[in-house]
Structures are given as structure tokens and as C-alpha cells.
Amino acid sequence: MKAIFSLYNIVSAILLLVLLAEFSTAELNHDKNRRGANMGLYAFPRVGRSDPSLANSLRDASDAAVFDGLYGDASQEDYNEADYQKRAGLVAFPRVGRSDAELRKFAHLLALQQVLDKRTGPSASSGLWFGPRLGKRSVDAKAFSDASKGQQEFN
């Protein structure tokens, strides 16, 4: 009975060591595909437009539509393949979040309104103090006593 129990312990220990060795090598091989520890510190140049309505760098979508109507879409024949190379250093990031022009305009107006409310609200101040100077004034004790001797009080 003791021999079976000790055989079970030996087999369990060997199985545990084999599994540990397998998973530790898998973790080492997996590290090659991960980013480095300082990858987040590099600023990647972002590629693409944030708002498709701002085609051809025009601010108004209707102007962009007129421009596209006049000039049409560029085709592959318009570009010389020798001049065109894919830049490997550029990383295409998808634009995420509120990228609508109306939302940006609303957020800008809301921020402007908050600034104006702070300037004209009840807690607004000019930031200047026109009263007497506050705080400790450095006065020489001897000079103060000499100055007080020359002053007289009139009753």
C-alpha cells in the first residue's frame, strides 16, 4: 500500500515538472511577439483623416463635394508606381471617439461658456488687491523706535 502511494506521489511530481517546463517555455516563446516595455513611449505618426466630411482639407462638406465633382477621384493610373512606396514607419490608427464636426463645435462652445461663466460669476475677481499690504513687514526695531521719538501726539 505504501509503495502504491509513493509511486502515485512520484508520478504526480514528474507530471507537475513536465507541465511546469512546458508552460514556462511557452511563456518564453510568447514574449517574442509582445511589444517591448517602452513601446508606449514612442509617438507613432498617425495616418488618415479624422473626419471623412473634411475631404481634401476643406472645412465645409459641401465645398468638398463640389471639389470632388470638378476633379473626380484619383485613379491608380495617375500615380507613378516608382514614386509611390509604402512607408513602413507609419502606423494607421483608427479614429476613436467623438469625431463629428457638430460635436466638436458644441464642445468648443460649451468650454467657452464655462470660461465666461467663471469670469462673470459671483466668485469672479480681477485678481488684483487694492487694499493695504498684508503680512509681516521687516522693520528694524531701532529705526522704528527712532522714528517714534520724533512723532508727537496732540490732544
Curated annotation (Swiss-Prot):
GO biological process, any: neuropeptide signaling pathway
Residues found modified as Valine amide: 47, 96
Modification type Leucine amide: residues: 134
Keywords tagged on the record: Amidation, Cleavage on pair of basic residues, Neuropeptide, Secreted, Signal
Propeptide segments, given as residue ranges: 27-33, 50-85, 99-117, 138-155
Main location: secreted
Cellular compartment(s): Secreted
GO CC annotation, single: extracellular region
Region forming the signal peptide: 1-26
Gene Ontology MF terms: myostimulatory hormone activity; neuropeptide hormone activity
Function: CAP-1 and CAP-2, but not CAP-3 are ligands for the Capa receptor. CAP-1 and CAP-2 are probably components of the signal transduction pathway that leads to Malpighian tubule fluid secretion via the second messenger nitric oxide.
Similarity annotation: Belongs to the pyrokinin family.
Protein name: Cardio acceleratory peptide 2b
Gene source species: Drosophila pseudoobscura pseudoobscura
Origin organism lineage: Eukaryota, Metazoa, Ecdysozoa, Arthropoda, Hexapoda
Gene: capa
